[in-house]
């Protein structure tokens, strides 16, 4: 009985250690905002609306429309930095 309990505890510790090691990774902490691939998002002064044809309008060329769920109104935002945001084809 003691051998089975001891073996079970060894396996449990091994699994816990393995999960922690896998999730911790090897990333070193850095200063806030020091990431080389950080993105800055700023609200533009305009809002956007969804038309009857399903197209969004109201944002300038350098801003995109962001909305929540099925809302037909949204806010325009401008992103700057290293990001790969897909542009919808018109």
UniProtKB/Swiss-Prot annotation:
Molecular-function GO terms, alphabetical: C-X-C chemokine binding
Cellular location(s): Secreted
Lineage: Eukaryota, Metazoa, Ecdysozoa, Arthropoda, Chelicerata
Disulfide bonds: 44-63, 48-65, 59-76
Signal sequence range: 1-24
Organism the protein comes from: Ixodes ricinus
Sites carrying sugar chains: 47
Protein name per its UniProtKB record: Evasin P458
Cellular component, GO annotation: extracellular region
Function according to Swiss-Prot or TrEMBL: Salivary chemokine-binding protein which binds to host chemokines CXCL1, CXCL2, CXCL3, CXCL5, CXCL6 and CXCL13.
Keyword list, A-Z: Disulfide bond, Glycoprotein, Secreted, Signal
């Amino acid at each position: 009985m003691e051998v089975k309990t001891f073996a079970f505890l060894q396996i449990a510790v091994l699994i816990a250690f393995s999960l922690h090691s896998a999730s911790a990774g090897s990333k070193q902490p850095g200063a806030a905002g020091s990431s080389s691939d950080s993105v800055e998002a700023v609200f533009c002064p305009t809002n956007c609306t969804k038309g009857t044809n399903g197209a969004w309008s109201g944002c300038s060329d350098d801003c995109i429309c962001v909305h929540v769920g099925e809302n037909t109104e949204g806010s325009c935002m401008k992103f700057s930095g290293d990001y790969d945001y897909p542009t919808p084809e018109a």
